[in-house]
């Protein structure tokens, strides 16, 4: 009887530990929830985070990015680009490479985080309206087969824009939807 009780309590503790570990791993890991595959590339993206400021640190210097006007916000999308088939794919991540918006035609281009940022003295702490975007995904990249590159893309979007899709249009056109446009809204 004592052996059976100890076995049940050990099993209960083990089950509780496994449940807790599963919960913490799933809650604490950043998930790139959405992805689409094209002919040569895979694009994976997280749901856009809308903030009023974004910053990154490069060579010990902190730089901050702000929206271009008071009626705009920054949308940050963590993006991963994967080369599955071609030997080497040259990719140019620039304003024309990615747009964010909805399938009804309202879109905003990615902004150059290096040109739009301003150097600040001192440190800045992330909070719900200020986001750290290290590493930044921008510039010329040669992506070999079987490799991937990840980073943050920044968009200067009007307030109220429906951020339903990121449209990747470098090498090939790949839209990645964050919302279900075809769901019956009855």
Which residues make up each language-model segment?
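Bacterial N-terminal signal peptides that target proteins for export
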Residues: 2-14
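Hydrophobic membrane-insertion alpha-helices, especially the h-region
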Residues: 15-19
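Generic short N-terminal amphipathic or hydrophobic helices
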Residues: 1-2, 20
């Amino acid at each position: 009887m004592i052996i059976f009780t100890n076995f049940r309590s050990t099993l209960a503790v083990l089950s509780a530990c496994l449940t807790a570990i599963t919960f913490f791993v799933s809650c604490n890991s950043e998930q790139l929830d959405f992805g689409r595959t094209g002919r040569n590339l895979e694009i994976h993206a997280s749901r856009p985070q809308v903030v009023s400021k974004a910053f990154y640190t490069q060579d010990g210097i902190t730089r901050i990015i702000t929206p271009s006007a008071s009626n705009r916000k920054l949308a940050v999308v963590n993006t991963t680009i994967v080369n599955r088939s071609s030997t080497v794919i040259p990719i140019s991540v620039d304003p024309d490479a990615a747009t964010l918006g909805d399938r009804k035609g309202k879109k905003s281009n990615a902004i150059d985080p290096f040109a739009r940022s301003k150097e600040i003295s001192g440190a800045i702490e992330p909070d719900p309206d200020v986001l750290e975007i290290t590493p930044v995904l921008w510039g010329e990249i040669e992506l070999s087969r079987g490799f991937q590159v990840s980073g943050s893309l920044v968009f200067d979007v009007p307030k109220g824009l429906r951020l339903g899709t990121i449209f990747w249009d470098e090498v090939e056109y790949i839209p990645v939807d964050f919302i279900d446009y075809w769901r019956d809204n009855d």
